[in-house]
């Protein structure tokens, strides 16, 4: 659709990132009116990401370039508990040192594509492993 008013949806459409959108007019209006926040999560099962993650990384990059704030959610907690994602065998569990090494490797990938900091459109990186230590009082 070439009628997008938001720069993000326009770029995504021009680059054929969009297949379908539910209520694109409302989404376009939101993205045009104010800065938005979006996240994508990545498990820490390896010290780098494979090419299958490139679409998500580029979406976050364009999201930021259009003035919005991307969040990279590292799946340290998900990696600890395992997530077979419909596979027949459970994922091999990694120890804390391996997970930390993998997180650092993945972080270097994102630092090539996103600007991290405290500004309104600077990317944030957080880790769902931090949520595992929260008590009900903290939630």
Question: What residue spans do the PLM features occupy?
Answer:
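Short, internal active-site loops enriched in acidic
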Residues: 129-135
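Active-site-proximal loop->helix
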Residues: 79-100
């Amino acid at each position: 659709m070439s009628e997008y008013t938001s720069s993000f949806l326009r770029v995504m459409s021009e680059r054929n990132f969009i297949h379908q959108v539910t209520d694109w007019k409302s989404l376009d209006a939101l993205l045009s009116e104010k800065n938005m926040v979006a996240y994508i999560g990545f498990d820490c099962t390896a010290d780098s990401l494979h090419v299958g993650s490139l679409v998500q990384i580029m979406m976050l990059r364009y999201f930021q370039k259009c003035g919005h704030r991307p969040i990279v959610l590292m799946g340290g907690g998900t990696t600890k508990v395992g997530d077979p994602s419909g596979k027949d065998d459970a994922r091999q569990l990694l120890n804390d040192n391996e997970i930390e090494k993998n997180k650092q490797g993945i972080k270097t990938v994102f630092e090539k594509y996103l600007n991290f900091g405290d500004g309104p459109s600077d990317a944030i990186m957080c880790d769902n492993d931090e949520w595992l230590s929260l008590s009900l009082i903290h939630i």
